[in-house]
């Protein structure tokens, strides 16, 4: 599994790389994002700039650089061209709704770097079969924040407990496209603990996850706290993979569902 960390500071990116973070995630998406996620405890990377692509690619040697661009618009081609020219390894398209948008994204990139779709709209979910028919999709990440908003849900992990994530994954698997979903907290933190979410990633054979806001909170203390929690997460993932036949995945989901019921009681 690839672990992703949102970061635009080259010095910090190198530190994350050295501790084994697989991908540094540069977030250029700004179009419509504030309005969609207003009032939510989500990461909006206002300080990230397209000029950071070259700064990061010039210092990364083992970690890949993933760049989330803006939703498709009249400036997309120039944005994509600069990202590729400046050294991005993977480009991620957010907020797409149609096969046509995906095809345009794939055509502009033209196999020069890896492509990743961020599936996070109800329209894309309903049109998943048409979208998957496009050649050239390397990866799909299911974005729980915006997808749960798009579907009018109250908590992003309802998509997991309600079977929507698994439904999407079953659609993806025949196409041999790598996939991941959402973010993850340290093993013992988060509204739904990182350990419970990690077990779902293992059960569903996910190949990527983003280190979420509770990991950033550890950086307020010191880098060592972050690294210790990250290494524990990686080691736990290896343990679960090697012992998956002994893991009670069914009971894990029962616990997740109970926790979500309690969370929603407090929200409503």
List where the protein language model places each region.
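Hydrophobic faces of well-ordered beta-strands that scaffold small-molecule active sites
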Residues: 1-6, 24-26, 65-69, 91-93, ...
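Glycine/small-residue-rich loop that forms an oxyanion/phosphate-binding "nest" at active or ligand-binding sites
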Residues: 61-94
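C-terminal alpha-helical cap/extension of soluble enzyme domains
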Residues: 76, 174-268
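Catalytic cores of alpha/beta
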Residues: 10-19, 75-85, 101, 122-135, ...
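Conserved N-terminal beta1-alpha1 strand-loop-helix module at the mouth
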Residues: 1-64, 72-74, 136, 257-268
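Glycine-rich phosphate-binding active-site loops on the catalytic face of alpha/beta enzymes
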Residues: 24-34, 88-101, 139-151, 200-221
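Active-site-adjacent beta->alpha loops and helix N-cap segments on the catalytic face
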Residues: 32-56, 73-77, 95-113, 124-127, ...
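Glycine-enriched alpha-helix->loop->beta-strand junction motifs that scaffold or abut catalytic
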Residues: 19-24, 84-90, 109-115, 133-140, ...
């Amino acid at each position: 599994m690839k672990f992703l960390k949102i970061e635009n500071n080259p010095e910090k990116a190198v530190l994350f790389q050295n501790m084994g973070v697989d991908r540094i995630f540069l977030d250029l998406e700004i179009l419509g994002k504030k309005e969609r996620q207003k009032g939510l405890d989500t990461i909006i990377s206002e300080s990230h700039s397209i000029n950071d692509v070259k700064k990061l690619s010039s210092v990364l040697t083992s970690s890949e650089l993933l760049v989330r661009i803006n939703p498709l618009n009249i400036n997309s081609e120039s944005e994509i061209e600069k990202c590729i020219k400046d050294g991005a390894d993977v480009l991620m398209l957010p907020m797409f709704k149609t096969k046509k948008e995906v095809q345009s994204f794939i055509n502009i990139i033209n196999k020069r770097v890896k492509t990743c779709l961020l599936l996070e709209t109800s329209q894309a979910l309903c049109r998943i079969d048409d979208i998957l028919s496009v050649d050239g999709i390397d990866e799909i990440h299911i974005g729980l924040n915006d997808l749960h908003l798009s579907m009018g849900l109250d908590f992003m992990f309802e998509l997991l407990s309600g079977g929507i994530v698994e439904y999407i994954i079953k659609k993806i698997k025949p196409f041999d496209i790598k996939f991941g979903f959402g973010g993850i907290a340290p093993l013992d933190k988060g509204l739904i603990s990182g350990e419970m979410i990690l077990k779902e990633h293992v059960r569903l054979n996910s190949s990527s996850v983003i280190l979420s806001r509770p990991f950033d909170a550890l950086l307020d203390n010191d880098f060592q706290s972050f690294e210790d929690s990250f290494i524990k997460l990686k080691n736990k993932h290896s343990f679960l993979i090697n012992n998956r036949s002994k893991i009670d995945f069914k009971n894990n989901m029962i616990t997740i569902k109970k926790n979500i019921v309690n969370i929603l009681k407090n929200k409503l």
